[in-house]
Design a protein with these regions (language model features):
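Aromatic- and Gly/Pro-enriched, solvent-exposed loop/edge beta-strand patches characteristic
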Residues: 153-157, 176
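Primarily secretory-pathway and cell-envelope proteins
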Residues: 3-130, 174-192
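Extended, solvent-exposed segments with strong compositional bias
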Residues: 124-153
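A glycine-anchored, Pro-Gly-centered beta-turn/N-cap motif
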Residues: 154, 163-168, 172
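Periplasmic N-terminal soluble interaction domains immediately after the signal peptide in Gram-negative
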Residues: 1-4, 169
Length: 192
């Protein structure tokens, strides 16, 4: 699998009300300080696996977790325990090709989740499978509550409601397609 992990600084402009606004396109930006905003480039899912051990050992009626895997056990981008993000959506171009950041999208279409680390990778449980069906959904208990404030047309400041523990995190789209061709997670690390 391929992990896109380039972090590039973006330029910012100041709006009339003193808020920083990226002068670049749609996406998610980490606000490092009042003077520095960094574009977050997603990591792409390298594989997907299902742990069917319990199903085989005990019963086919037991659900098995479906996980997506990111290469490397740590994100390139590091931040503090109460990170602030800027979400920029396309409000002008009527961009319907980009379901993530199109004109009908809002921060409520995204979830913040903690990723499980292994020696070589990071994982996210995206659902369960049973003998009868697959159920793809990120459970409520996995989602970290976010607050958001609109600061301009299609521009929102987003942050966790409570400080985060050290570890690996990701921002995911609620209707993501979890495959190795297009599945992506906007990942970051909190220092220990």
């Amino acid at each position: 699998g391929y992990a896109a992990k380039n972090v590039s600084a973006s330029t910012t402009t100041t709006t009339d009300n003193g808020q920083n606004k990226p002068s670049v396109g749609t996406g998610i930006y980490l606000i490092k300080s009042s003077a520095e905003t960094v574009e977050m480039n997603p990591s792409y899912i390298s594989s997907k696996k299902t742990d069917r051990t319990a199903q085989f050992l005990v019963s086919g009626l037991i659900d098995a977790d479906i996980r997506v895997i990111l290469n490397e056990n740590k994100a390139t981008l590091e931040t503090s325990n109460l990170p602030k993000f800027q979400f920029v959506f396309d409000t002008l171009k009527n961009n319907n090709e980009n379901q993530w950041f199109g004109k009908n999208s809002t921060p409520k279409n995204f979830f913040l989740v903690k990723l499980k680390t292994t020696k070589k990778t990071r994982e996210l449980i995206i659902g369960t499978t049973s003998a009868l069906q697959d159920q793809i959904e990120i459970k409520e208990k996995q989602k970290i509550p976010l607050k958001n404030k609109k600061i301009g047309p299609g521009v929102y400041e987003v942050s966790p409601i409570s400080p985060l523990e050290p570890g690996e995190y990701g921002i995911v789209f609620s209707n993501a397609i979890w495959d190795t061709n297009s599945g992506k997670i906007y990942d970051f690390s909190l220092k220990k």
